[in-house]
């Protein structure tokens, strides 16, 4: 079947203003094709590097159904297709085309596609890209025609007028010749129309496809941002047709796939170059939602609470009362004469539509200030009533018409309340209002808000003064009209609303709603509540709005959240499997589809709302895990006695079953009888295991420069901060207390490591110093100075046998041969002989030789000891030399190997540190700039302090700065609270570490799995940064055997219990054995005791589970209603933040190399055979002792003789008398006369 193209007019066709007609055009097949993971694009202009970014925008959801359209000459049904229908644009479009002959030429965007509205044309005419926005007379079948491989006609539109955008892009030559074979080109586009701009994103991929759209991941980059400014609701594709003549054009093979964008959340992964390398559609399935919740592509095994990325609003519901009358603002503002200010007048406005845009867009008003509400929000709000107060004052007095102001006007004429909600509008009327007007200049008391005093005097004294308004007076004294609009918030049905059009009421779907100005997001459902006649909203116990009255139908509607938040995802870990199970907390399985709005979920999510693997638990509904009655190791505790495990099909079940299984944990049958026989497993064999346990006992100490953090360099802020008293001091005091506690934790933990008990050194006793006589108890193997003096000491290298020899020998030399030791199969003796040993062995040798003749050789047996001890000593010398040689050889080889490994490790470490240094240096300046900027951008307003002070007066500026200070103080308080919580956790960990130091290191714990995994043998502590590392040596069961056991045995009416261990039966007899090792013993009175009788007492334990308390949440509505002020916040310049090098330093290769080097270094540890040091003390012979004693006696005698031969009268200060031998003849002495001094000449 041919497609005939006929020109309307030949001249128009030549001018490219004609159109073509297609005869007998079949309807598109509209097959559905999965988008897989295509269509991701850069949705903003911000550069990001090495970061995961969560963004909400309009994206093509992964695995969306794309509709397929063709340009096809002849298909299997003998039809030709030229599919170019008008398609819905929606919130954006994803467009992908597979072709080989450049069939797809462009698009037309618009609304009505006629000349009454503007449309946008973006087409490729084979030489240029044409972009136009005009009122077009579009062709019914817009197309290009190609004749004999060359462009012939452009039948897109007939004419165009009222063009507002005209642009020609690029000059090129498009290959228009038709091609055969597979599709070679895949072009993808995304179109978004936002704020008057049509943004176009594109990517190209070379393919070789016979049909279909390839599965994969694609990222589109921005190419155009066109300021069209038109309404786009639909679009249409422009394609080309081909012919070898100038008529009878036929289509060539091409296909395009379209899908609409949806507002959803994506997580984008950017590499160091700012390129998107991976993406996740957070609403695609439970695992994708979990990855977005924890913001990580890799998820470890466990159960995780998720955030809601599943349901987003689909429509907008706006409901205002059916009011058509316009509010009479013109009568208020255009009154002929305004009253005096003291006699101000009020007008009530109700039952009308208020178009406030006319007011705040007017350029005639000199003042338009709103309090408690933003002018731009008025169009969306409804009020019970609006009051308009009017009066006339001077231009300079307008400032007093505001909440909290003082002055003549505010005190004595017109006063606004501090919580005023409304707008003040003023404009100069110097030419209109002239003459005398009155105001009250004084009054005994000030007026209350909205109080009016019409009197002209007070106690006979006139209180009114006059304004003299003339155009010639200064501006400050000229007449100014003032209108104060007071808004009465909804406490009754709304009568004044903005001019916003209402929409249809949509129920049972997630929508954005606006009821009389109450905005929100939720699901609207029919309610059974009853309202009072004046009631518009309903509130729950937490004072949150949970129901509303529709202002048009007066129907009461419940408002529920769009999503059910109590959803947890169970995963075995993404490294093991992508399979998950979902737990809906506190929900019956029958209610799950309604609770999560399953009809709005993706198909991948919807399978987790119903299905065959549905398991109702006390914790909620578990879907996606197979419930089994068996029990396995609890990998993932879910709660409420439920556990999940992950197994492969080969180790658990037959092929085809789920990999995640869930089961109820049980300690036995609920109705089991006490003392009934039960089976237990008792270890019969063990293996040694070493477990490493790291326990934190301290954390990094921190302090905060409070003033700098809150105020930066702002003097005004610092002065205001002083009013907060000692907050900063208390804050740092708390941080200091945390630091002190960390030191205390460390001290207490490591104080548990006590040294071995040592005997105190007794150096002084009763005034006598024994340090040179008694041995030093701190060195128990050393002898004292006197002992070293009285004995000769010989030190030898010990290959491993000399110490045992010395202990055996003692002081008896005759035991020398008996104390010979075994070493590596040889009998050895130390190569050392004392004089006693030499004398003994010599005597035996001589005696043996002398008696050999007359004892017929039997006496030669006395030579054997001498020969044996010589052989043994030669063996001792030999093995010692061999050990020394082998050790030297190992030292040389391993030292050389260690040196090379150390050199390599230093090189690798240097490379890694170089990388770290580069990143640290690059980030330092950028981080400093960022901190400085952030220090002025925090809290209630997004503005720097200087800007606050410059645009607000002092009082309001201090209020705003006070909010900023309060926000930052709250942040600091939260930080300190987190530190205190962390310190409490550290404290608990330190206490446990101290307990393990006492029980595991200094003792042997009997608690199973407390000191390591298994039964404890010994533990070794090692200090670690901010903690301690325990190396627990344990023995764990390698083999177990099941035995029937009983807690007690009844015999003759008495119950016998084991003193230690358990009773077990081997099938025929009962024994008692240890619980941790099977060592059966006969039951006797020694290992049992008798207690009580055989009666069984069963106790019932209360199993009540209490629900957690729900704290009552205070309502912020009243507070927030006061602060919807008209304050514009300037953008804060954080441009320097892009200077941060947020790249992740990849030093994994260096770390792996270091690990390898460390392994090699460990292998190079020298396992030397230990050479001990053996010291032997040799006693002197008897004659030496005899000479030593005789020498001491001679020394004493000589000392006494010398004393007696001198002229001393005594020796040793009178301790011994020498009077008989020390007295001289008195006659030879000179006379001594008392009191006479003799002089010698």
UniProtKB/Swiss-Prot annotation:
It is a single-pass type I membrane protein. Specific enzymatic cleavages in vivo yield mature proteins. The precursor is processed into S1 and S2 by host cell furin or another cellular protease to yield the mature S1 and S2 proteins. Additionally, a second cleavage leads to the release of a fusion peptide after viral attachment to host cell receptor. The cytoplasmic Cys-rich domain is palmitoylated. Spike glycoprotein is digested within host endosomes. Residues 784-805 are annotated as: Fusion peptide 1. Gene3D superfamilies: 1.20.5.300, 3.30.70.1840, Single helix bin, Spike glycoprotein, N-terminal domain. Its main location: virion. The keyword Coiled coil applies. Residues 1-13 form the signal peptide. Residues 888-938 are annotated as: Heptad repeat 1. GO terms for biological process: endocytosis involved in viral entry into host cell; fusion of virus membrane with host endosome membrane; fusion of virus membrane with host plasma membrane; receptor-mediated virion attachment to host cell. It comes from the Viruses. Belongs to the betacoronaviruses spike protein family. Homotrimer; each monomer consists of a S1 and a S2 subunit. The resulting peplomers protrude from the virus surface as spikes. This is Spike glycoprotein.
């Amino acid at each position: 079947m041919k497609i005939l193209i006929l020109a309307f007019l030949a001249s128009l066709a030549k001018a490219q203003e004609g159109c073509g007609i297609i005869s007998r055009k079949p309807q598109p097949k509209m097959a559905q094709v999965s988008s897989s993971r295509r269509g991701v694009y850069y949705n903003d202009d911000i550069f990001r590097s090495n970061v995961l970014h969560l963004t909400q925008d309009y994206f093509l959801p992964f695995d969306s159904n794309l509709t397929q359209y063709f340009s096809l000459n002849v298909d299997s049904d003998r039809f030709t297709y030229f599919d170019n229908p008008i398609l819905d644009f929606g919130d954006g479009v994803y467009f992908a085309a597979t072709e080989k002959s450049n069939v797809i030429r462009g698009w037309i965007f618009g609304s009505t596609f006629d000349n009454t509205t503007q449309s946008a044309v973006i087409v490729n005419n084979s030489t240029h890209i044409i972009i136009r926005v005009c009122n077009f007379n579009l062709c019914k079948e817009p197309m290009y025609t190609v004749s004999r491989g060359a462009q012939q006609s452009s039948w897109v539109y007939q004419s165009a007028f009222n063009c507002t955008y005209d642009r020609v892009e690029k000059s090129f030559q498009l290959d228009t010749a038709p091609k055969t074979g597979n599709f070679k080109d895949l072009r993808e586009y995304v179109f978004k129309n936002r704020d008057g701009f049509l943004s176009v994103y594109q990517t190209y991929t070379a393919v070789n496809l016979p049909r279909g759209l390839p599965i994969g991941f694609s990222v589109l980059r921005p190419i155009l941002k066109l300021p069209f400014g038109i309404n786009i609701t639909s679009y249409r594709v422009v394609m080309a047709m081909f012919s070898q003549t100038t008529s009878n054009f036929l289509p060539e093979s091409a296909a395009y796939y379209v899908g609409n964008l949806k507002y959803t959340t994506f997580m984008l992964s950017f590499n160091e170059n700012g390129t998107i390398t991976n993406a996740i559609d957070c609403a695609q399935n439970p695992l994708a939602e979990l990855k977005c919740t924890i913001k990580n592509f890799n998820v470890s095994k466990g159960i995780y609470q998720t955030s809601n990325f599943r349901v987003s609003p689909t429509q907008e519901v706006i409901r205002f009362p059916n009011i058509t009358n316009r509010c009479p603002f013109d009568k208020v503002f255009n009154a002929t004469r305004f009253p005096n200010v003291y006699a101000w007048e009020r007008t009530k406005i109700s039952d009308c539509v208020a178009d406030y845009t006319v007011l705040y867009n007017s350029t005639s008003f000199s003042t338009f200030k709103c309090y408690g509400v933003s002018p731009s929000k008025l169009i969306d709000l409804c009020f019970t009533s609006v009051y308009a107060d009017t009066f006339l004052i001077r231009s300079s007095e307008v400032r007093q018409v505001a909440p909290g102001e003082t002055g003549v006007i505010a005190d004595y004429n017109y006063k606004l309340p501090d919580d005023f909600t409304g707008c003040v509008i003023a404009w100069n009327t110097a030419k209109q209002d002239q003459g005398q007007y009155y105001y009250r200049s004084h009054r005994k008391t000030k007026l209350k808000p909205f109080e009016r005093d019409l009197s002209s005097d007070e106690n006979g004294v006139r209180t009114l003064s006059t304004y003299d308004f003339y155009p010639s007076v200064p501006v400050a004294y000229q007449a100014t009209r003032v209108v104060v609009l007071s808004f009465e918030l909804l406490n009754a049905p709304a009568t004044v609303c903005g001019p916003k059009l209402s929409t249809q009421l949509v129920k049972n779907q997630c929508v954005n709603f606006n009821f009389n100005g109450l905005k929100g997001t939720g699901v609207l459902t029919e309610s059974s509540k009853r309202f009072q006649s004046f009631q518009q909203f309903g509130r729950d116990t937490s004072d949150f709005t949970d129901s509303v009255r529709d202002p048009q139908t007066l129907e009461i509607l419940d408002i529920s959240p769009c999503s059910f938040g109590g959803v947890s995802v169970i995963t075995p870990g993404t490294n093991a499997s992508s399979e998950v199970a979902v737990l809906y907390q506190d929900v019956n399985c029958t209610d799950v589809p309604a609770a999560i709005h399953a009809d709005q979920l993706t198909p991948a999510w919807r399978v987790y709302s119903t299905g065959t693997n549905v398991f109702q638990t006390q914790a909620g509904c578990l879907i996606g895990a197979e419930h089994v009655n068996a029990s396995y190791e609890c990998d993932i505790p879910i709660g409420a006695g439920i556990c999940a495990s992950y197994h492969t099909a080969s180790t658990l079940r037959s092929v085809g079953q789920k990999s995640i299984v869930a089961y109820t944990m049980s300690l036995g049958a609920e109705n089991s009888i006490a003392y009934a026989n039960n089976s237990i497993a008792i270890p019969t064999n063990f293996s040694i295991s070493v477990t490493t346990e790291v326990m934190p006992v301290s954390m990094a100490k921190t302090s905060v420069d409070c003033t700098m953090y809150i105020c930066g360099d702002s003097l005004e802020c610092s002065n205001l901060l002083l009013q907060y008293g000692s907050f900063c001091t208390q804050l740092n005091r708390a941080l200091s207390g945390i630091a002190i506690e960390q030191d205390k934790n460390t001290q207490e933990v490591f104080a548990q490591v006590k040294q071995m008990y040592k005997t105190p050194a007794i150096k002084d006793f009763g005034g006598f110093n024994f340090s040179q006589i008694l041995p030093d108890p701190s060195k128990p193997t050393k002898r004292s100075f006197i002992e070293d003096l009285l004995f000769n000491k010989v030190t030898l290298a010990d290959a491993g046998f000399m110490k045992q020899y010395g202990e055996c020998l003692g002081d008896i030399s005759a035991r020398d041969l008996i104390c010979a030791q075994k070493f590596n199969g040889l009998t050895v003796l130390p190569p050392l002989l004392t004089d006693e040993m030499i004398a003994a062995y010599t005597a035996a040798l001589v005696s043996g030789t002398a008696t050999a003749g007359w004892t017929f050789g039997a006496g030669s047996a006395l030579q054997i000891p001498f020969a044996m001890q010589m052989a043994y000593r030669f063996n001792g010398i030999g093995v010692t030399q061999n050990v020394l040689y082998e050790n030297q050889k190992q030292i040389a080889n391993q030292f050389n190997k260690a040196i090379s490994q150390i050199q390599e490790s230093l090189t690798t470490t240097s490379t890694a540190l170089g990388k770290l240094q580069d990143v640290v240096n690059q980030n330092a300046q950028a981080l400093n700039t960022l901190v400085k900027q952030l220090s002025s951008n925090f809290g209630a307003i997004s503005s720097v302090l200087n800007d606050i002070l410059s645009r607000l007066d002092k009082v309001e500026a201090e209020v705003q700065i006070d909010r900023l200070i309060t926000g930052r103080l709250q942040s600091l308080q939260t930080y300190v609270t987190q530190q205190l919580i962390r310190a409490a956790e550290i404290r608990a960990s330190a206490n446990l570490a101290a307990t393990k130091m006492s029980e595991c290191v200094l003792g042997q714990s009997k608690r199973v799995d407390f000191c390591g995994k298994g039964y404890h043998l010994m533990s070794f502590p090692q200090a670690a940064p901010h903690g301690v590392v325990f190396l627990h040596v344990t023995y764990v069961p390698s083999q177990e055997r099941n035995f029937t056991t009983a807690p007690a045995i009844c015999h003759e009416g008495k119950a016998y219990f084991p003193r230690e261990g358990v009773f077990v039966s081997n099938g025929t007899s009962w024994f008692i054995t240890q619980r941790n090792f099977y060592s059966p013993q006969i039951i006797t009175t020694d290992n049992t005791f008798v207690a009580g009788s055989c009666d069984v007492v069963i106790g019932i334990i209360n199993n009540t589970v209490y629900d957690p308390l729900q704290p009552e949440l205070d309502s912020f509505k009243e507070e927030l209603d006061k602060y919807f002020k008209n304050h514009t916040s300037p953008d804060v310049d954080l441009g320097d933040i892009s200077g941060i090098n947020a790249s992740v330093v990849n030093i994994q290769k260096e770390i792996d190399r270091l690990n390898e080097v460390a392994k090699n270094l460990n292998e190079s540890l020298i396992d030397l055979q230990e050479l001990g040091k053996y010291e032997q003390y040799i006693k002197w012979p008897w004659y030496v002792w005899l000479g030593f004693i005789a020498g001491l006696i001679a020394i004493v005698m000589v000392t006494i003789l010398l004393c007696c031969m001198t002229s001393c009268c005594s020796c040793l200060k009178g301790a011994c008398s020498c009077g008989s031998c020390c007295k001289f003849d008195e006659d030879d002495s000179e006379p001594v006369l008392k009191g006479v001094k003799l002089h010698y000449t």
